[in-house]
Design a protein with these regions (language model features):
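N-terminal-proximal low-complexity accessory segments that begin disordered
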Residues: 20-32
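An acidic- and aromatic-residue-enriched active-site/binding cleft used to recognize and process polar
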Residues: 22, 139-140, 166, 202, ...
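Glycine-rich phosphate-binding loop of actin/hexokinase-like ATP-binding domains
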Residues: 30, 38-49, 279-280, 286-348, ...
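Long, contiguous domain-sized segments
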Residues: 288-291, 298, 344-365, 374, ...
Length: 592
């Protein structure tokens, strides 16, 4: 009883305010306790002011907070425009404030290591999981002369130099050789323009490295990214990298320091906070399946996958629906983008849209043509990012092992391009086309972009993420059944039966190869689903031809049957392909 009373008092005391600063939008979210559980009370969204002409995030933050104040009638800022903390007796302010940020320029980084395939590969994996832009990589196998390496370091205009190499207690001379190159290169740079140096190599050399750089250069020590040959540790080094990113952004964009003060010095990178939520979910869902998170932003595309708590996170800063959008033409191609369109458009019209969107990333589609273009681009951005992300997934789940996506539960998706569609069917079809899930999984939409805020708040307020994830703030699009197997189109591959728990009549039917269908089951409703696949067809019950049953939850669409095959094969004839894309939109209910 005493424990319940103390838990209740903690919940009653904690009003949580969260800010997420993106490159296009700044979001404010207010959470409070309702009937003993945390709930999302209000959100505010404003254009980000991190870029030109202001280069100061403060204005966007205050506009987003003003929206929350207007909706709730709750005062959050005092007369001096400062956050009121903790909550006053009149109910103004917040008890806990958390902040995340992805806005700001890319952090130009020089990576210096010993051997490719060991510490250098670990460091590259860490760079891929955050907002670093590798502009130069130098290692022992680099055949350039030392003078050229030094010149490249000096000319890189880097914000950060990351030095790795040597297991703990391992290589010494070769590490110091690289350290000397860095020291000479950095000393050629004017003092005010010198980058921060992060050393995350052989820890036994930490004091020697510090002595070599002395007080002349800005160096931070971090735990070794590869303490042993078969052991990788990126978690602790990420903290030092996060500080370097914050420092680099703070030099070019104002306002971050204020958010740090409000959050008690703990402004998180959006990617780190997002990964934390995906990792948490993997510990409470089916351990045999991966939790996949996809976020399509204006300046990046994130793919997070967690396998029983083993998080693999990739932030692709070359892929986004804003400024970097034209790069998709190099990473993929125009034909791959246009293959997803249900309408006939000239190539030049698609190119014009891509370049216009990169200049004006805040533009919202106002007509069908723009909507279809954005969703086609989103498909290709996700597919390209996923292909790259899977290179670092565990063996057996990576692209070298199988072209199939591993079994997933759930798939969490976010990004304005998905959240703002006129019907959830558009978002669902985009994800099915881009990810091609197999077996049985659930697709969940994060329409308010709450995941980073929940990740940031999981430290000071652990119950917040648990409660909000279980509330209606996340939208389940539905349960997906995607059979895998080879057979000709139109052939029966599956028999199914749905028995709703609420007393509605049971539904039975057959599924044929090539079908895409939706069986309505509303959010909050549950049913027992029985699947009996034909020989050679795998629906996720442990092998081809194996039948099974499970309890499923409803969603915005219901039960989605995607029997179009894996891999998804599109018609080579452009006209027939467009007709098929149009048909799929009708099949999934996006068009009515």
């Amino acid at each position: 009883v005493e424990r319940e009373r103390s838990m209740s008092s903690v919940l009653d005391a904690d009003t949580v305010l969260a800010i997420d600063v993106g490159s296009v939008s700044t979001r404010a979210s207010l959470f409070d306790v309702v009937d003993g559980r945390y709930r999302l009370i209000a959100t505010g969204r404003a254009p980000s002011t991190a870029g030109a002409p202001l280069f100061d995030i403060s204005e966007g933050v205050r506009m987003a907070l003003d929206q929350v104040q207007a909706v709730t009638g709750r005062q959050l800022l005092d007369e001096s425009e400062l956050l009121i903390m903790p909550v006053t007796s009149q109910g103004a302010g917040a008890d806990v404030f958390v902040a995340t940020a992805s806005a700001g320029p890319k952090v130009r980084t020089v990576l210096v290591g010993l051997m490719p395939g060991v510490s250098t590969t670990s460091a590259q994996r860490m760079a891929d999981s955050t907002y670093l832009e590798l502009v130069e990589v130098i290692n022992l196998l680099d055949r350039r002369r030392d003078e050229e390496k030094i010149s490249r370091i000096a000319a890189a205009r880097a914000d950060l130099i990351l030095v790795v190499g040597g297991t703990d207690g391992g290589a010494r001379d070769s590490v110091m050789q690289m350290i000397d190159l860095v020291a000479v290169g950095v000393e050629l740079i004017p003092a005010r323009q010198r980058p921060r140096i992060v050393y995350a190599g052989n820890r036994r050399l930490a004091s020697v490295v510090a002595e070599r750089f002395g007080n002349r250069l800005d160096i931070a020590q971090a735990p070794n990214v590869r303490p042993a040959l078969r052991h990788e540790d990126l978690v602790h080094a990420r903290l030092a990298i996060g500080e370097a990113i914050a420092e680099a952004r703070g030099k070019r964009v104002n306002g971050f320091q204020e958010l740090e003060q409000w959050s008690g010095g703990y402004l998180m990178l959006t990617a780190d906070a997002y990964g934390r939520v995906i990792k948490y979910l993997s510990r409470i869902y089916d351990p045999e399946k991966a939790v996949i998170g996809v976020d399509v932003g204006a300046s990046h595309t994130m793919v997070a996958a967690s396998f029983e708590g083993d998080l693999r996170l990739r932030v692709d800063t070359d892929l986004g629906l804003g400024k970097p959008l034209p790069i998709i033409l190099k990473r993929s191609n125009l034909e791959n983008i246009m293959r997803w369109l249900p309408l006939d458009l000239p190539k030049q019209a698609v190119l014009d849209y891509i370049h216009n969107k990169s200049i004006h990333p805040g533009l919202v589609p106002s007509e069908d043509t723009a909507l279809h273009l954005e969703l086609a681009l989103a498909r290709e951005l996700i597919r390209t990012a996923l292909k790259q992300a899977r290179t670092s997934w565990p063996r057996g789940k990576d692209l070298k092992s199988t072209w199939l996506l591993p079994p997933t539960e759930p798939i969490i998706a976010s990004g304005s391009v998905l959240a703002r569609t006129p019907h959830p069917g558009y978002a669902a079809l985009t994800l099915l086309d881009a990810l091609e899930p197999i077996g049985i999984s659930t697709m969940v939409l994060d329409p308010h972009g709450l995941s980073p805020s929940l990740g940031a708040a999981s430290g000071p307020v652990p119950m917040l993420a648990v409660h909000v994830l279980e509330s209606g703030s996340y939208i389940s699009l539905g349960t997906v059944v995607a059979p895998v197997g080879r057979t000709r189109p139109g052939r029966k591959i599956l028999t199914l039966q749905i028995e709703p728990e609420q007393g509605s009549e049971a539904i039975a039917g057959e599924v044929r190869m090539g079908q895409l269908a939706v069986i309505p089951l509303r959010q909050g409703e549950y049913a027992r689903l029985t699947l009996r696949p034909e020989r050679g067809i795998d629906v996720g019950f442990g092998g081809a031809g194996k039948a099974g049953a499970l309890r499923i939850a409803g969603g915005a669409l219901g039960l989605i049957i995607d029997a179009r095959g894996r891999p998804l094969k599109l018609d080579t004839d452009p006209a027939r392909r467009r007709d098929t894309n149009e048909k799929w939109l009708w099949d999934i209910g996006a068009k009515e």
